[in-house]
């Protein structure tokens, strides 16, 4: 698993992903184990990420999974049930909560954003 900072650089340097998310303007919560991060997105670019320390701060929606689940999802070739966030959701490996309308309206953008933290072939 790469650092959050490295992941954000990968997201913001992916022109196709930014173009796909050009209408996305929101903050969402992404949980890795005990840690939640607020991702602020403007026109498809991640403008800021902050570790959530105040529990009342939240985003439009939340995606949360245990660290081991995300580590498996971010493998270069993820194992069965870890290859896609909906497969993970069906197996109760992640939780999706909140106002899901913008998530579903931009589904491929968010799936690609999350998958962009996958390990590269070396």
Q: Where are these predicted regions, by residue range?
A:
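Feature captures hydrophobic
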Residues: 1-122
